[in-house]
Every structure is written in C-alpha cells, then in structure tokens.
Swiss-Prot record:
<dbReference type="InterPro" id="IPR000073">
    <property type="entry name" value="AB_hydrolase_1"/>
</dbReference>
<feature type="active site">
    <location>
        <position position="357"/>
    </location>
</feature>
<dbReference type="Pfam" id="PF00561">
    <property type="entry name" value="Abhydrolase_1"/>
</dbReference>
<keyword id="KW-0486">Methionine biosynthesis</keyword>
<dbReference type="GO" id="GO:0009086">
    <property type="term" value="P:methionine biosynthetic process"/>
</dbReference>
<feature type="active site">
    <location>
        <position position="327"/>
    </location>
</feature>
<feature type="active site" description="Nucleophile">
    <location>
        <position position="164"/>
    </location>
</feature>
<keyword id="KW-0028">Amino-acid biosynthesis</keyword>
<comment type="function">
    <text>Transfers an acetyl group from acetyl-CoA to L-homoserine, forming acetyl-L-homoserine.</text>
</comment>
<dbReference type="InterPro" id="IPR008220">
    <property type="entry name" value="HAT_MetX-like"/>
</dbReference>
<comment type="similarity">
    <text>Belongs to the AB hydrolase superfamily. MetX family.</text>
</comment>
<keyword id="KW-0808">Transferase</keyword>
<dbReference type="GO" id="GO:0005737">
    <property type="term" value="C:cytoplasm"/>
</dbReference>
<dbReference type="GO" id="GO:0004414">
    <property type="term" value="F:homoserine O-acetyltransferase activity"/>
</dbReference>
<feature type="domain" description="AB hydrolase-1">
    <location>
        <begin position="59"/>
        <end position="363"/>
    </location>
</feature>
<comment type="pathway">
    <text>Amino-acid biosynthesis; L-methionine biosynthesis via de novo pathway; O-acetyl-L-homoserine from L-homoserine: step 1/1.</text>
</comment>
<protein>
    <recommendedName>
        <fullName>Homoserine O-acetyltransferase</fullName>
        <ecNumber>2.3.1.31</ecNumber>
    </recommendedName>
</protein>
Length: 380
C-alpha cells in the first residue's frame, strides 16, 4: 500500500493533494496545544478518502471512528489494514455516503495506533512516547482532525458522522465549530460520560495496567506487551457492546463444545469473549487503548461552556441523533437528551436492534437511512 506524507506549511495549505482513494496519507500538522495546556510536538494524523474532492471543496463528509477503529472505513484488509473496513459499505458509489457526489474523509484519531501520533509513536528524542504521552480529550481529537484538514486546504465540511467515540467527536465538532459544518449525525453516545461509562472504562484501563508487561506504560520496543491485560479489558468491554438478550439467545449457559464447566471447563460465552479479546490484542496497541479510554471518560460537551444544556442549545447546526434500543453502554435516554436540547434536531431516531451498542455498526441498512438524511440536510 502506498503511504503519502503530507506536511503543513506556515500558510496551512496543502503541499500535496489528498491521497489516492483508499490509500493512507500521513499529514504532519506540527505542534498541537492540548486542552490541558500541554504542547504535543510533531503531530501526524493518518487520513484516507473515498470519492473526489469538489473544486470548491464543499462536498467533504468526515467519518469519525470509535474507540478501536481507524481511518479504514471501507474496503478489504491488506497492507496497513489488518481488518476490513469497520463500516464497510457505508461509503462508495450508490452507498449512503455516495462517493459519486461526496468525498468521504476519515482520520485515525489523535492517540491512535494506525498512523497517527500516539503512545507507540516516536517522540522527538527518537524513543516511543509510551508513558510520556499526554492525556488527551475528545476536544483535542477534533482539533487535530481540523488541523489535518486545514493542511489539505479544507476549512469547512458538509457533514460529520460518527457513532460511540466517533459520535462524541461529531458532537464536539458541531458545538465547537458550528460555522464550519452544515449537518451532523450523532449516534449511540451522550453529551458527557456517565458514571457507569467512566467506571467501565477505568476498570478496563486498570486491567491493562495490572499486567506486569505494562511496564509503567513503557513496554514499546521491549519485546513484551500487556497482552493478557488487554484481552481482559476487551472481554469486559465487549459485554457492554452487545445486547444482553442477544448474548443469552446465542449462548445461554451452554458449555463450550465438549467442556464441562462443573469440572473446570468453559461456558460458550467465555470462549466467545476470549476470542474477541485475543482478536483485538493482535491488532491494537494497549497504550492507545488506555489513552483513548481516558479520553472517552473525559467527554463532556458542556465543560467550560456553562454545562451540557447551555452547550447543546448554543448549536444551531441541523443534526440527526440516533440511538439503539438495546444499547446498555450508551442507553437511549442519553440520545433523548441530545435530541431535546439540540435546536437543529427534529427528534430522536430510534434504531430497533438486538445487537446493543454495536447496533450502530451492524444495522447498516437502518443507519444508512440516517446517513442519507443527514446529507440531505447538508444540501439545504
């Protein structure tokens, strides 16, 4: 896979064009001042796009990934992409984001591990950032994305769309920069992190840090990584991503194959969760998991803005808000609050799904309708 590096100039304009469709571009945005005042130097953001950029650059749709996603929204696995697109089929000719008309752009979020600057990246001293990587927020992620777009000569977007952490990013974008976006889709998220979410995320972080191979966060390059802690964190997280009824319908209390839980064997659901944990641990950096989990726990669109209600009511942008009926991580009451307080929302769209929080990824036909409606709003 070709990787094109793009470096911001003092004028903020692009020195090279967007990468070829589906290819990764590395955009160097320079130093970024974070919300807590820390200056993160030499920041790089990985970018992919699908569809052609219009001459007036007015057809950009930002697709924002969740916790363990990346810039690879759609397409097969391959070099640089250990898995197929995480929202495969959402962008392309005739797709909800119709690339015959729109230019879909996705980044790997700040703090990520698929080309963007994160804990596994090299700091200016040539050593991995590791434990020295600063705490970041959702607001910082949006600032980095916008800086990457500015480096490519894009200062406004037609729409931002995302679910879960991507939904938090979309919401921050809409509230912080309402003059630079025409519409938004906010899925399966709330206005701020809840106590339950913070508890869930901090427990996952604790599992990773309890692994002796965490090494205080400085395990990169040592030949050892906190894989076991990462797997446990993912097993716990996956339970919050799926619907309770769906899991019971699939597994109930059935033993795994020929194993007997009464003599030390596993239940089928244990095997399933172990598989999910191992799958993520093979492709995702534990340090990034910690940094992004902490960013999610910091999510609060009302911080510094007079609270959630004041922040949401200040946003005039047309917004589609969607929630999943069986979501137990971001229950539908959280999206109801968004729908009631955002002036540009015409009411909550409910996706009836058994798949829990992951419904925003699984129910592509239903979610696709929400994407199409969002882009209709962007054309008004």
């Amino acid at each position: 896979m070709t990787i094109i590096e793009e470096r911001a100039t003092d004028t903020g304009m692009a020195t090279v064009p967007l990468p070829a469709e589906g290819e990764i571009g590395l955009v160097h945005i320079g130093a970024l001042t974070l919300e807590n005042g820390t200056v993160l130097p030499d920041v790089t953001i990985a970018v992919q796009r699908w569809g052609e950029l219009a001459p007036d650059r007015g057809n950009v749709v930002m697709v924002l990934h969740a916790l363990t996603g990346d810039s690879h929204v759609t397409g097969p696995a391959g070099d640089g992409h250990p898995t197929a697109g995480w929202w495969d089929g959402v962008a392309g000719p005739g797709a909800p984001i119709d690339t015959d008309h729109w230019c879909a752009i996705a980044t790997n979020v700040l703090g990520g591990c698929r080309g963007s600057t994160g804990p596994g990246s090299l700091a200016p001293d040539g050593k991995p950032w590791g434990s020295r990587f600063p705490q970041i927020t959702i607001r910082d992620q949006v600032a980095a994305d916008r800086a990457a777009l500015a480096a490519l000569g894009i200062t406004e977007v037609a729409a931002v769309v995302g679910g879960s952490m991507g939904g938090a990013r979309a919401l921050e974008w809409l509230v912080t920069h309402p003059d630079d976006v025409r519409a938004g889709l906010v899925l399966a998220v709330g206005a701020r992190a809840t106590a339950d979410q913070i508890g869930t995320q901090s427990t996952q972080v604790a599992a990773i840090k309890a692994d002796p191979d965490w090494q205080g966060g400085d395990y990169h390059g040592t030949g050892r990584a906190p894989t076991e802690g990462m797997e446990i964190a993912r097993r716990f997280a996956h339970l919050t991503y799926r619907g309770e009824e769906e899991l019971d319908d699939r597994f109930a209390n059935t033993p795994q194959d020929d194993e007997d839980p009464l003599t030390g064997g596993r239940y089928a659901v244990q095997s399933y969760l172990e598989y999910q944990g191992g799958k993520l641990a093979r492709r995702f950096d534990p340090g990034t998991y910690v940094v992004l989990s902490d960013a999610l726990s910091s999510h609060d669109v009302g911080r510094g803005r007079g609270g959630v209600e004041a922040a949401l009511r200040s946003c005039p942008v047309p917004v589609v808000v969607g929630g999943i009926t069986s979501d137990r991580l971001y229950p539908i009451r959280l999206q109801q609050e968004l729908a009631e307080l955002l002036p540009g929302c015409q009411g909550l769209d409910v996706v009836d799904s058994i798949y829990g929080h992951d419904g925003f990824l699984v129910e592509t036909e239903l979610v696709g309708k929400l994407i199409r409606r969002t882009l209709e709003l962007a054309q008004r």
